[in-house]
Design a protein with these regions (language model features):
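Two-component/phosphorelay signaling modules centered on CheY-like receiver
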Residues: 18-36
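Acidic, metal-coordinating helix/loop segments flanking the phosphotransfer/catalytic sites
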Residues: 37-55, 117-119
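Receiver (REC) domain active-site loop signature in two-component systems and cognate sites
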Residues: 62
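Non-catalytic signal-transmission and effector/linker regions of two-component phosphorelay proteins
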Residues: 1-10, 113-127
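Active-site residues of response regulator receiver
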Residues: 59
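Acidic catalytic/metal-coordinating carboxylates
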Residues: 39-43, 66-72
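Alpha4 helix (beta4-alpha4-beta5 surface) of REC/receiver domains from two-component response regulators
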Residues: 69, 91-123
Length: 127
């Protein structure tokens, strides 16, 4: 199991599903992350005015501002462009899904053992 110094890494989790948000936040907290959560892309952008997360995990399909729009905004902002972004999606469209089209650094399918995927993705993203 990936274990980081308890105060060393901050993650921002963005998902409109309370169940997914809770699952991902709990998973990260158990591995020593400090975690902040938002329910949509607009709320996440507001939080990022004062937060400097080490990683952002975001759903793709959300109301108000989708994950695709959030990722685009983050990658176009020099202040947040280098933060690793993990996109969560229940969709897989052909060879490229919405996460890849949005320029996410990593993507995870919600329908397949999300915790195992998070474990391996965090190891890649944060070493």
């Amino acid at each position: 199991m990936l274990k980081l110094e308890s105060s060393s890494k901050l993650a921002l989790v963005v998902d409109d599903s309370m169940l997914i948000r809770h699952t991902v936040c709990r998973f990260l907290e158990e591995r020593g992350f400090q975690v902040e959560a938002a329910t949509n892309g607009l709320e996440a952008l507001e939080m990022l005015a004062t937060l400097e997360p080490d990683i952002i995990i975001t759903d793709i399909q959300m109301p108000r501002m989708s994950g695709v729009e959030l990722i685009s905004a983050l990658k176009n902002d020099p202040r947040t462009a280098e933060i690793p972004i993990v996109a969560l999606s229940s969709l897989k469209c052909g060879a490229r899904g919405p996460a890849e089209d949005a320029r996410a650094d990593f993507s995870i399918l919600k329908d397949i053992d999300i915790e195992a995927q998070l474990e391996s993705t965090l190891a890649l993203a944060l070493g």
